[in-house]
Every structure is written in C-alpha cells, then in structure tokens.
Amino acid sequence: MKKMTTLCAGLLFLLSSSVFAEEHLKEALEHANAAAVHGEDGDTAILIGHAKAALEQVLEASIVAKGVAKNHLNEAAKELQESIELANLGHIGSATLHAEAAVKHVKISDKYINSFVIINKP
C-alpha cells in the first residue's frame, strides 16, 4: 500500500511539474517571438523588454525541466542574455538573431516537455 501511494504521489508530481513548465514556456515563447519581431523593426528598447521577460520565464521553466528539454532551455537562456547584451550595445541585428535562436530552443524544449506529458497522462 505504501508503495502504491508513493508511486501515485511521484506520478502526480511529475505531471504537475510538466504542466508548470508548460505555462512558463508559453509565456517565454510569446516574449521571445515579440523580441525577435521588434528587433527586425529596429525597436531596441522593446526588444530588450521582451527578451528580459522571456529570459525570466525560461529560467522558471528550467527549474522543473529535465533532460533534453532542460538543455534547450539553458541554451535559450544563453541566447536571450546575449540578445540583451548586444541590444544594449546597439547591435540590433545580432541581438535579433540571438532572439530568433532562443525561439527555436524554446520550441524544441516545448516539444520534449509536451511529449513527456502525453506519455505520462493517465
């Protein structure tokens, strides 16, 4: 009986942590996309604001992510940090490229997290 309770508790934790990560990934993707779009428009300040918001959400999601998903979130965080730094230096074109790279990493991470949720749903 204790084993069954422990197993159920563990499964619930895994499912809830994946759902937690999904919420942050959605926000991160929206902000990273917005950063890239505003970068293409040359709006440095808006790019920086969205990149910072995306970075915050990526870091929150990476707390509970595991494996390949976590690796891609870490890469997305690096890309967003680089985007912010380059935008602050006035290199909007390079900053935009890093924001776009972050979008790709967040999307890949989302696929891995969603596939985990689908496999583990009762």
Region spans (language model):
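Sec-dependent signal peptide recognition
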Residues: K2-A9, L14
